[in-house]
């Protein structure tokens, strides 16, 4: 589904793959089961995904907020300007969150086992509710194993803070 000037809204559906792209408008996806790739993008607008269950989530925003709540296998998010808020009910594959200007927040289940690599040029990194092992910590960088390690979780923002915390549902 493509839109040049206007919002895209999709809800209560099952699909193999789904792509929603808006040049100037919001993308709002709710209560979707996607067996393949769910791809949501906006050049100038917010991207909001709630109650999602997908094998692979890809999302991008040039200028706007980006949020995701649900289950996903592989997660890839890219933003230029705006905050990112990802709330995963469980960790099923690698996560890559990249931003230029804006805070990035990842909430994940308490039992998730992953290798964390978080980096920011001008911002803080906060890890709450998890213990990190065999790691590297310096201003702007936090690396290490959470719950013994596992999937790769890479978070990078140039100008913004990074928060990794337990999902309140876990």
Model regions: which residues?
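Intrinsically disordered, low-complexity terminal regions
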Residues: 1-170
């Amino acid at each position: 589904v493509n839109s040049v000037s206007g919002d895209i809204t999709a809800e209560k559906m099952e699909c193999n793959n789904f792509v929603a792209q808006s040049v100037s408008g919001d993308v709002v996806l709710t209560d979707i089961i996607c067996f393949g790739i769910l791809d949501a993008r906006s050049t100038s607008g917010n991207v909001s995904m709630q109650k999602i269950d997908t094998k692979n989530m890809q999302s991008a925003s040039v200028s706007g907020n980006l949020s995701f709540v649900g289950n996903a296998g592989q997660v890839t998010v890219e933003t230029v300007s705006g905050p990112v808020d990802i709330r995963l009910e469980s960790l099923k594959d690698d996560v890559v969150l990249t931003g230029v200007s804006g805070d990035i927040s990842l909430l994940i289940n308490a039992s998730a086992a992953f290798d964390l690599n978080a980096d920011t040029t001008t911002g803080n990194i906060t890890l709450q509710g998890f213990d990190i092992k065999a790691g590297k910590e310096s201003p702007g960088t936090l690396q290490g194993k959470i719950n013994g390690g596992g999937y790769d979780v890479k978070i990078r923002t140039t100008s913004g803070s990074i928060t990794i915390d337990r999902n309140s549902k876990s």
